[in-house]
Amino acid sequence: MKLVRKYPYKHYNRFSDTTGRKYLVDSVKVPSVTTILGATKDKRFLDNWRRKVGNEEADRIMRQASTIGTEMHQVLEYTLNGQGYYNAMEEGAKPRMMAKTILDNIKIEEVWGNEISLEYQNKFAGTCDLSALCYGKPSIIDWKQANKPKKEEWVEDYKLQLGAYYLA
């Protein structure tokens, strides 16, 4: 897919410190949207799940989900940049399948940018996965990976994240 440079997106350097992920925006250290949301969300569900499955299993599941999510993002980013990406290793199969399912089920007409830094009045910043024209409408997309469907109340942070990106 061809990249259309519709907006002059800036790039902000991202780094982590003891308080979480931050971006350097015009010499100001600005917290990331995900750091803010992580600090304000109710962690009881995650804590209960960790107690139920045990720390070792919870860590294994989280590492596996992170690996699959990162790989899926790579496939989507490179594909939408027109470069193509293929991890022939066994761990690449599931992310490829997930990315293909996404791309087969979304109508992306123009790609305006991948991995775009966004910031709002030096208050917060983040990186959205895709800015594009989808179904004839300007869209901000942040890809999410899950091994099974999530309940509506479990994705509230995702909606808040996209709302913050929309403001930026």
Name the predicted role of every residue range.
Residues 1-125:
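Metal-dependent nuclease catalytic cores that hydrolyze phosphodiester bonds in DNA/RNA
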